[in-house]
A protein has these predicted regions:
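N-terminal leader/capping segments at the start of a protein or of a new domain
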Residues: 1-59
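Extracellular structured ligand-interaction cores
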Residues: 4-6, 68-71, 117-120, 129, ...
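Double-stranded beta-helix
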Residues: 7, 11-12, 16-21, 98, ...
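Glyoxalase I/VOC metalloenzyme domain signal
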Residues: 13, 21-25, 47-51, 65-81, ...
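A generic structural signal for residues embedded in beta-strands
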Residues: 20, 133, 149-150
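Conserved short histidine dyad/triad with adjacent acidic residue
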Residues: 25, 71-117, 151-154
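Ligand-binding loop in jelly-roll beta-barrel domains
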Residues: 69, 77, 137-139, 143-146, ...
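A short beta-strand-loop-beta hairpin characteristic of the jelly-roll/cupin
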Residues: 109-143
């Protein structure tokens, strides 16, 4: 996944809008999730307040808490991708936990790739084709331009094609109702 330019606006001391930063955001990768790249473009752990200076809010976990959000791109390798030896080692998994804090803890042991978070995820497939799997065993194939709204349900993403899949997500922290 390439790096992406990020332009951020804010307000000057007089409340006038201005560009406060114009730079490049680099993707995050980890040997513990081989072939997966994520680019965290913006996020916050609480509601935005304006006017502001446009400084990037601090946040520490992959998934936002209630009232928070993340704006992330995600790439998934093609079906014929072979993970490098050692990618399942303790060291590689520890690296993945540091690189994508809170992500691996949402995965289920009994269904590879299946995970659940307390978020509403709005996703857009930018390129490629990906299969959305759900806990009931259903699968939905999504292609470039398709969107999905993921409402805190257990799901997985599988790339069965020969091309890398790239998706754009807005994750919004949500409250989970008692069952």
């Amino acid at each position: 996944m390439p790096s992406r330019r990020r332009v951020v606006t804010g307000h000057d001391d007089n409340g006038v809008s201005t560009v406060v930063s114009d730079g490049v955001v680099e993707p995050r990768t980890s040997p513990g999730l081989p072939g997966v790249d994520m680019l965290y473009l913006w996020g916050a752990d609480g509601p935005a307040r304006h006017p502001d200076a446009g400084a990037e809010p601090a946040w520490t976990q992959h998934f936002p808490p209630v009232g928070g959000f993340r704006f992330v791109t995600f790439s998934l390798p093609p079906a014929d991708f072979v993970a490098p030896e050692g990618s399942d080692s303790d060291a590689a998994q520890a690296d993945a936990r540091r690189t994508f804090p809170g992500l691996l803890e949402t995965y289920r042991d009994d269904q590879p790739g299946m995970h659940t978070s307390d978020t509403t995820d709005v996703a857009l497939v930018l390129s490629g084709e990906v299969v959305l799997g759900l806990q009931d065993g259903s699968e939905t194939t999504l292609k470039a331009g398709d969107t999905v709204v993921q409402n805190g349900t257990g799901h997985s993403w599988t790339n069965r094609s020969s091309e890398v899949v790239e998706m754009l997500f807005v994750l919004v922290g949500a409250e989970r109702a008692e069952a």
